[in-house]
């Protein structure tokens, strides 16, 4: 019995060290948000010059897409420098009719598509071959609302030399439920301590699935080919492998609708976790090799990011081990100490692993 207790204790502290090291990495990198940004990491203001295509993949979105299109029609950007394209796929409602009524152009998928990544791949190929006049592509989800200055600020990023950029993703419905409030807090923390911090470090921000811009040159050079359930972070991994910095554009704001119920949130988080693990299996080795060989910091950073679901599982194992250890006669003082430690870990993991 004593030997078993010693083994469990060694395992617990070993895993605890792994978790806290992971937390410490994000804590330290997050502190760079308070650092003064260097000139090379700043986005300057420019006159609108970039012609952009706004791409919206839509599946049965007739109830929400109209609001997005109205906000896009109100952009503080020359009308001759952007067009809105809606790509209906597998729809059984009148999404296409609503989009047309708001002035959007329609691209019909002529190949079978099962995911947003499939739709984007088809659309990018279509745009390169049929609409070469556009210099950049903006991707939105159909339930978004876009700030009037969005395109102008993304134009600034493109003119500043960035070829991929992520917006400031905010929440459209933060007060509708405690779930949507948690999402709102998460994105505030992620934008500040992750994206803005990395922008000041000269690293890459994350891509959050909506409100991001890709230069036409990037698509022409490498295409857009994703196979996992999370096409956004998979594309971010591909950018890291190619030393393509992703800018964070704080003043380009997208308001995104968040889940209201725990079941809806669980379904979404499950998909994100599965997709992240798929990306980890596919890219982690390549990212670490790229970091070791070429010294690209965002490759290392992205490799650690993919470990988030694993860290969540390890945290559960630690809690379970404590329970078993307690049954075997753990001191009450140790239980209290762990409860305090676990509270601190939970606060950290709310940011790291959400």
Predicted feature locations:
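Basic/Trp-rich segment in TM-proximal cytosolic loops or flexible interdomain/linker regions
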Residues: 1-12, 16, 34-45, 201-202, ...
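Cell-envelope/extracellular polymer assembly enzymes that use nucleotide-activated donors
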Residues: 50-53, 83, 234
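Acidic helix N-cap motif at the loop->helix transition within catalytic regions
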Residues: 64-66, 93-100, 149
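Short, acidic, metal-binding catalytic loop of nucleotide-sugar glycosyltransferases
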Residues: 70-81
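A conserved acidic beta->alpha catalytic loop
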Residues: 88-96, 111-113, 145
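Long helical/loop segments within the catalytic core of UDP-sugar-dependent glycosyltransferases
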Residues: 108, 113-130, 148-229, 270, ...
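Short beta-strand-to-loop acidic/aromatic patch adjacent to the donor-nucleotide binding site
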Residues: 131-145
């Amino acid at each position: 019995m004593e030997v078993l207790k010693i083994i469990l204790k060694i395992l617990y502290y070993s895993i605890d060290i792994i978790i806290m090291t992971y937390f410490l990495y994000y804590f330290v990198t997050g502190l760079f948000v308070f650092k003064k940004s260097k000139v090379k990491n700043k986005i300057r203001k420019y006159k609108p010059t970039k012609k952009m295509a706004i791409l919206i993949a839509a599946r049965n979105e007739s109830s929400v897409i109209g609001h997005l299109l109205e906000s896009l029609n109100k952009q503080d950007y020359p009308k001759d420098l952007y067009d809105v394209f809606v790509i209906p796929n597998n729809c059984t409602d009148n999404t296409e009719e609503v989009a047309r009524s708001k002035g959007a152009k329609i691209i019909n998928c002529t190949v079978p598509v099962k995911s947003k990544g499939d739709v984007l791949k088809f659309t990018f190929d279509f745009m390169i071959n049929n609409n070469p006049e556009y210099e950049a592509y903006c991707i939105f989800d159909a339930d978004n609302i876009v700030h009037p200055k969005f395109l102008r600020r993304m134009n600034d990023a493109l003119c500043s030399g960035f070829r991929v950029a992520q917006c400031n993703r905010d929440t459209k419905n933060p007060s509708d439920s405690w779930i949507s409030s948690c999402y709102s807090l998460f994105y505030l923390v992620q934008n500040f301590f992750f994206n803005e911090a990395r922008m000041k470090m000269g690293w890459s921000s994350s891509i959050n699935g909506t409100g991001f811009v890709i230069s036409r040159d990037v698509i022409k050079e490498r295409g857009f080919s994703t196979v996992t359930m999370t096409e956004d972070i998979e594309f971010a991994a591909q950018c890291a492998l190619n030393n393509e910095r992703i800018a964070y554009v704080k003043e380009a704001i997208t308001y995104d609708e968040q889940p209201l119920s725990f079941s809806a949130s669980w379904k979404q988080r499950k998909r994100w976790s599965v997709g992240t693990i798929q990306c980890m299996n596919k890219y982690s080795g390549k990212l670490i090799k790229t970091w070791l060989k070429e010294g690209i910091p965002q490759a290392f950073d992205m490799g650690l990011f993919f470990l988030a679901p694993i860290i969540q599982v390890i945290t559960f194992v630690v809690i379970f081990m404590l329970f078993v250890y307690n049954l075997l006669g753990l001191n009450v003082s140790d239980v209290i100490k762990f409860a305090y430690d676990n509270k601190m870990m939970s606060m950290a993991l709310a940011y790291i692993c959400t």
